[in-house]
From Swiss-Prot:
Pathway given in the UniProt record: Glycan biosynthesis; glycogen biosynthesis
Function: Catalyzes the formation of the alpha-1,6-glucosidic linkages in glycogen by scission of a 1,4-alpha-linked oligosaccharide from growing alpha-1,4-glucan chains and the subsequent attachment of the oligosaccharide to the alpha-1,6 position.
HAMAP family found in the cross-reference section: GlgB
Gene3D superfamilies the record matches: Glycosidases, Golgi alpha-mannosidase II, Immunoglobulins
A Gene Ontology term for the protein's cellular component: cytosol
Name of this chain's protein: 1,4-alpha-glucan branching enzyme GlgB
Organism from which the protein derives: Streptococcus agalactiae serotype III (strain NEM316)
Catalytic residue list: 300 (nucleophile), 351 (proton donor)
Assigned keywords, A-Z: Carbohydrate metabolism, Glycogen biosynthesis, Glycogen metabolism, Glycosyltransferase, Transferase
Catalytic activity: Transfers a segment of a (1->4)-alpha-D-glucan chain to a primary hydroxy group in a similar glucan chain
Pfam families: Alpha-amylase (PF00128), Alpha-amylase_C (PF02806), CBM_48 (PF02922)
Entry's family note: Belongs to the glycosyl hydrolase 13 family. GlgB subfamily.
Length: 622
């Protein structure tokens, strides 16, 4: 586009590659700087090439509020900032909102960097992604905080060049299908989760270079691993040298003070109704998708964008007298529309905790158009249940079965995320009831239930081997736990469970309707046993039975819809996984008998605090 077109589309919220105009760009022998600061009194460029404030480079402002200047002295790798004079004469140093790289901390300057036009070698993956999509594919996500998965030999976070050599082989070995990273965009603290961003186009310096991350994604794709990233379009850090009140007025944030300030997180909320902010944010999302070939974006804190009263501070009702943030609603619909028009096979996932807005319904039906939503209700209920003493679980059996009431209202991801293993909530293993043996047994049972329940899967790093302590973002995982036999067996179990999930289409082919599940018995409160069948579109099935008390049940009998010879294909209490069973249940033939609405029954021994999954080895005539 011409500069005139760039400015016009920026102003109407339709410039979706804003980084091609704003920011710093190499032009012949010079670098051109452009920044949007419509209400600034003056803006200058300062940096290594101006001896900082000694020889500031004056910028000129156009009618759209964009300031521009060219420098023959600037070089790639130079540090720079914008020196912004606000109304009233206050002068502040600001980062470049469009910078693609930032100075290593404690510095906060932007870096002049020309991004390479990578020759990608992941064509097979990208072609398969386009051809097969993802809705009817296995999705099992390993959630990672890049700074604390594993440290290097000097105790520093690994760069993506190092993670390529360590994390990717681990993902392959553990049979995950995708990896999801907590924010990789520039943020101001090394020791943080990364959710208060300062650079929406800048790759976080701690983790290496943009080129290293491109190579990491390419290597993942060559190993059949998809890559997802977390993205935070609702709020941003309130540091004075970043986006906050950029030109002295509400530039990126709301004009209204209470709407602008996020009291819960000590941040500022984007004005999602402002056209220029929409151009900025949608450009950021597309930049990560297109420049880094990522396979999906998880949008953080969607509830904060949808409801005016979600925060802890004061709020005012909208023009209809209710609590809906209409700007947030329309922005999210626009975001998904734009991305799906350009990249229909990139996943859009919402972290959203309410049930009043249709998150994954299509735009034509009034939904937000996301592909998936984290199932926060299921996660809270099921963790509460598994923490409870089994003696009382029969009285709270609805915590396990309630999800069947809304299971297909949305397309869900069943997530045990980083949020569940911090702030005194305990690690996944430590949440489980009982002594150490029963905690591991409970965790194996829980993970089997997650895999068999309809919905895509996510597990936070360290939970796969039963790390005992909570996640510490300033340290690496407790890899030393793997010196313990029980942790080794837990890791082996997760590895085999992940492969089991991939191998059985019944567990992922139909995740969005009751065509993929048949509830056998959700009323067995007294024994606290849940059973259902998962089905695919070819007629195959798996019988899934979960014993949620530490009582072995010999000759357990259950009705089945198909006569046949059944084979146990998963038993969470096998010795190799840390249990006590040396052998599987024997291959078993159904009996002709009435059991509820079924004409055939299957009898077997149900392991204590265990899950037992069966497949039909040979069908018999009824």
């Amino acid at each position: 586009m011409s500069n005139k077109d760039e400015l016009y589309t920026f102003g109407i919220g339709e410039n979706f590659h804003l980084q091609n105009y704003l920011g710093v760009h190499s032009e012949n022998e010079s670098f051109c700087f452009r920044v949007w600061a419509p209400n600034a009194e003056n803006v200058q460029v300062i940096g290594d090439f101006t001896d900082w404030r000694n020889r500031p480079l004056q910028m000129n402002k156009n009618q759209a509020g964009v300031w521009e200047a060219n420098s023959l002295d600037a070089r790639e790798g130079d540090l720079y900032k914008y020196l912004v004079t606000r109304k009233g004469g206050q002068v502040v140093e600001k980062i470049d909102p469009m910078a693609v790289y930032m100075e290593r901390r404690p510095g906060t300057a932007s870096v002049i960097k020309v991004l390479r036009n990578k020759k990608w070698e992941d064509g097979l993956w990208m072609g398969r992604r386009k051809r097969l999509g993802f809705q009817k594919r296995p999705i099992n996500i390993y959630e990672v905080h890049a700074g604390s998965w594993k440290k290097d030999d000097f105790g520093h976070p690994m760069t993506f060049s190092q993670l390529k050599d360590y994390l990717i082989p681990y993902l392959v070995e553990m049979n995950y299908t995708h990896v999801e990273f907590m924010p990789l965009m520039a943020h101001p603290l090394d020791m943080s989760w990364g959710y208060q961003l300062m650079g929406y186009f800048a790759f976080e310096h701690t983790y290496g270079t943009p080129e290293e991350f491109q190579d990491f994604v390419e290597a993942c794709h060559k190993n059949n691993i998809g890559v997802l990233v977390d993205w935070v379009p609702g709020h941003f850090i309130q540091n004075d040298d970043a986006l906050a009140y950029f030109d002295g007025t509400a530039t990126y944030e709301y004009q209204n003070h209470d709407r602008a300030h996020n009291y819960r997180w000590g941040a500022l909320n984007f004005d999602l109704g402002k056209n220029q902010v929409q151009s900025f944010l949608i450009s950021s999302a597309l930049f990560w998708i297109e420049h880094y070939h990522i396979d999906g974006i998880r949008v953080d804190a969607v509830s904060n964008m949808l409801y005016l009263d979600y925060d802890e501070g004061p709020w005012e009702a909208n023009q209809f007298g209710d609590n809906r943030n209409l700007e947030g609603y329309y922005f999210l619909r626009k975001l998904n529309k734009v991305i799906k028009e350009r990249h229909p096979n990139v996943m859009m996932i919402a972290e959203e905790s309410t049930a009043s807005t249709p998150i994954t319904k299509d735009l034509e039906s009034g939904g937000l158009g996301f592909d998936f939503k984290w199932n926060m209700g299921w996660m809270n209920d099921i963790l509460r249940f598994y923490e409870e003493d089994p003696l009382y679980r029969q009285y709270d059996f609805n915590l396990v079965t309630f999800s069947f009431m809304y299971i297909f209202n949305e397309n869900f991801v069943l997530a045990f995320s980083h949020d569940e293993v911090v702030h005194g909530k305990k690690s996944m293993m430590h949440k489980m009831w009982g002594d150490r043996y029963n905690q591991f047994a409970g965790l194996r049972n829980l993970y089997a239930y997650q895999m068999c329940h309809p919905g895509k899967k996510l597990l936070f790093m360290g939970s796969e081997f039963g790390q005992f302590l909570e996640w510490k973002y300033n340290d690496q995982l407790e890899w030393e736990n793997l010196n313990d036999d029980m942790n080794q067996k837990m890791q082996r179990y997760t590895k085999q469970l992940n492969q089991f999930y991939k191998d059985h289409k019944c567990l992922w082919r139909i995740d969005d309707s009751f065509d993929g599940i048949e509830i056998i018995d959700a009323d067995n409160k007294s024994e606290t046993v849940l059973s259902f069948i998962r089905k695919d579109d070819k007629g195959d099935l798996l019988l899934c039975v979960f014993n949620m008390t530490p009582v072995e049940r010999p000759n357990f009998t259950i009705g089945v819809p198909q006569a046949g010879i059944y084979e146990e294909v998963l038993n969470t209490e096998m010795e190799e996984f840390g249990g006590v069973w040396k052998n599987h249940n024997p291959v078993t033939k159904t009996q002709v008998a009435t059991w509820k609405d079924y004409d055939h029954t299957l009898s077997f021994t149900l392991p204590a605090l265990g899950a037992s999954v069966w497949r039909i080895k040979r069908r018999l005539r009824k």
